[in-house]
Every structure is written in C-alpha cells, then in structure tokens.
C-alpha cells in the first residue's frame, strides 16, 4: 500500500496537516493506503479518523499500521460514495489528479461546511485542471505547496 512517507506528495500532505488544527476534529483519510496520513492526524490530536480505500490490501495495511501504533479506528473498504456515510471536518486525499477529479462531487458530500480538504498526488502539469475544478466551485484555496514537480493543496469547503 502507498504511504511510506518518503514521496513528495505524502510529505507535503503531512506538512499541510501539521498547519491545520485537528484537535477534537473528525478526519477522513480517503485512499488511505498504509494509513500514514490518518495516523498522523490522530497523533496530532484528531478526535476520530476514519480510513477508506477501494483496495482490500490497502485497507488491511491501514488496519495493521493502526494496530502497530496502538490505535483503533474504522477502516472501510469500498467506493467513497457507496460506502462512507460520515461527515468529516478534515479530509486527507493523497491520490492522483484523475481520482481527485472523479471524487470532486463526492468529497463535499462527506465533509462539513468550513471543513478542510488536503489533497495531493497532483503533478504540476495537472495543477491548473485541479484548481479550475475545485476552487471557486465549493472550495476556497487556503494553502499550496510545490516540490519536485508535485503539488499539494489545502482548501476550505464554502
């Protein structure tokens, strides 16, 4: 499962997460992979973090990593729209531009107004496409990081 913490997109998500007040908040790690981002959110003080991935191996990896860290959380395996019924204050989505664009309508549905979307896995060549799709249409850009050809964004749901 993706998420060792060594990739630029993961590192930038962690930086944006560290700049976000997670204390007492509900977090959702979408496309959780190894669970590194959600585990970091819990370590930073999130009240609750749910994890979801369409890959059963990733969901199992996230469960194993939660266990290794002495944490418990709900881990869902399936499509976001069909599987998840919660509402998060913060969504972590380190995916790809194509997957983010596919989830554009689903992410706001599982997010509280004023919530923060942290998304990465976006190559520079696709940044404008992501910005056009998300910002001004339900989200306001709050922060952006760029590193070695990759982008990460923090956005607030309007």
Give the positions of each predicted feature.
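Conserved SAM/SAH cofactor-binding pocket of Class I
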Residues: 4-84
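Short alpha-helix immediately C-terminal to the canonical SAM-binding loop
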Residues: 59-60, 100, 127
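Hydrophobic beta-strand segment of the Class I
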Residues: 90-93
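A short glycine-rich, Lys/Arg-flanked "PGG" loop and its adjoining helix->strand segment in the class I
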Residues: 101-116
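ADP-ribose/adenylate-binding Rossmann-like module
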Residues: 114-127
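Conserved class I S-adenosyl-L-methionine
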Residues: 124-137
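Core SAM-dependent methyltransferase catalytic element
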Residues: 140-158
């Amino acid at each position: 499962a993706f998420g060792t913490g060594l990739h630029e997109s993961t590192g930038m998500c962690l930086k944006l997460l560290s700049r976000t007040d997670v204390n007492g908040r509900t977090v959702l790690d979408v496309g959780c992979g190894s669970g590194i981002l959600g585990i970091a959110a819990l370590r930073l003080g999130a009240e609750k973090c749910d994890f979801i991935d369409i890959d059963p191996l990733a969901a199992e990896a996230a469960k194993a990593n939660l266990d290794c860290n002495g944490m418990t959380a709900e881990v869902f395996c399936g499509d976001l729209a069909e599987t998840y019924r919660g509402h998060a204050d913060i969504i972590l989505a380190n995916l790809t531009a194509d997957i983010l664009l596919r989830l554009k309508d689903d992410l706001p549905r599982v997010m509280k107004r004023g919530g923060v979307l942290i998304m990465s896995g976006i190559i520079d060549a696709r940044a404008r496409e992501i910005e056009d799709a998300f910002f001004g249409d339900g989200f306001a850009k709050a922060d952006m990081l760029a590193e070695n050809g990759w982008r990460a964004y923090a956005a607030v749901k309007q």
